């Protein structure tokens, strides 16, 4: 069973190192298979708001968007995403951001149009599919308006993926470990 440490911290004060916590849980009979960290390979991805979407002048499947990030800064992003619309809040990897696989975002042109970053989906953010709603698994990850965030915030903090993920082995003698609460 996968358990984000953040979920546990919502109910219990855990003021020790993550690995020490995992070792203590194993000593109680709740075997920890592994400890992984959400977002450890992602850096520089932030929240933006889509202001405009236009058709790319030289490509049928590409769109040219204008987005707002922190401090009213406007960026132009070229994308092939089909699930976005004006007013959506989405994760954007700006120039200099690093995605899993040591993929660095650079300024570039797509079919002659400048792109100053890349929109991200759940896969680029390395969110385990078990934690992603079905309608958010494909395409760009659209943030819910009820989430509390500001433009420019680190998307790992907004989505709670800047945390440890603990995988427990559910042994036959511990059926009580089949749920968190």
Which role does the model predict for each range below?
Residues 1-181:
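Phosphate-backbone binding interfaces of nucleic-acid-interacting proteins
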């Amino acid at each position: 069973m996968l358990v984000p440490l953040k979920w546990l911290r919502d109910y219990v004060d855990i003021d020790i190192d993550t690995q020490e916590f995992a070792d203590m849980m194993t000593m109680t009979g709740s075997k920890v298979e592994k400890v992984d960290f959400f977002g450890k390979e992602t850096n520089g991805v932030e929240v933006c708001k889509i202001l405009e979407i236009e058709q790319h002048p030289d490509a049928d499947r590409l769109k040219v968007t204008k987005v707002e990030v922190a401090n009213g800064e406007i960026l132009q992003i070229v994308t092939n995403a089909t699930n976005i619309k004006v007013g959506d809040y989405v994760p954007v990897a700006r120039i200099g951001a690093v995605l899993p696989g040591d993929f660095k975002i650079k300024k570039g042109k797509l079919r002659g149009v400048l792109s100053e970053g890349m929109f991200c989906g759940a896969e680029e953010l390395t969110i385990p599919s078990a934690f992603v709603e079905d309608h958010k698994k494909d395409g760009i990850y659209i943030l819910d308006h009820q989430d509390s965030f500001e433009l420019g915030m680190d998307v790992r903090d907004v989505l709670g993926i800047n945390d440890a993920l603990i995988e427990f082995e559910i042994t036959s003698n511990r059926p009580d470990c089949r749920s968190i609460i």
